[in-house]
Regions:
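Glycine-rich phosphate-binding loops that contact phosphosugars or nucleotide phosphates
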Residues: 6-133
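Internal, active-site/partner-interface "lid" segment
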Residues: 87-90, 104, 131-159
């Protein structure tokens, strides 16, 4: 899976990508500007793009959908957005709407509530994929060598 996004949504995309990696699904975050300068070559047949944009209008992300389709016309897109009528949503194979929640910051602009919704949707995708692939604690422990999660997962395997 390849993840692309900008700004605060980009940080959410990075988190979702690393969570997929730790649960057995090879994933990478690709910054849209780097993709336009050759890194789009990471795309392979049967890859899936997950794009995140609250507005669904982020120029760099919309441009990337066209560039990626030029590279592989069969490439599938999932979009997480607060605007299911946006250009990005229209390009997607699957649109997952955040419901366009009002931002809780005093200005109503800083990504707060929207990024929380994006994170929740990403976590749901990870958990459902883990169920579908029947990802086990043994597989988890092989990917988590350090820290508390590594220690805990290894101890669960020993039982």
């Amino acid at each position: 899976m390849l993840f692309r996004s900008m700004g605060k949504a980009g940080q959410i995309a990075m988190n979702i990508a690393t969570t997929f990696c730790s649960t057995g699904i090879p994933s990478v975050f690709l910054h849209p500007s780097e993709a336009q300068h050759g890194d789009l070559g990471i795309l392979q047949k049967n890859d899936l793009l997950l794009l995140i944009s609250n507005s669904g209008k982020t120029r760099e992300i919309v441009e990337l959908t066209r560039l990626a389709h030029n590279l592989d016309p069969d490439l599938k897109f999932i979009v997480i957005t607060g605007n299911p009528d946006s250009p990005l949503a229209q390009e997607s194979d699957v649109c997952l709407s955040t419901g366009k929640p009002a931002e809780v910051c005093t200005l109503g602009m800083t990504p707060t509530t929207s990024t929380t919704a994006m994170t929740v949707i990403g976590d749901i995708l990870v958990v459902q994929t883990m169920k579908k692939t029947q990802f086990t604690i043994e597989e988890y422990s092989k990917r988590h060598h350090g820290g508390y999660l590594g220690e805990k997962s290894r101890s669960l395997c020993e039982k």
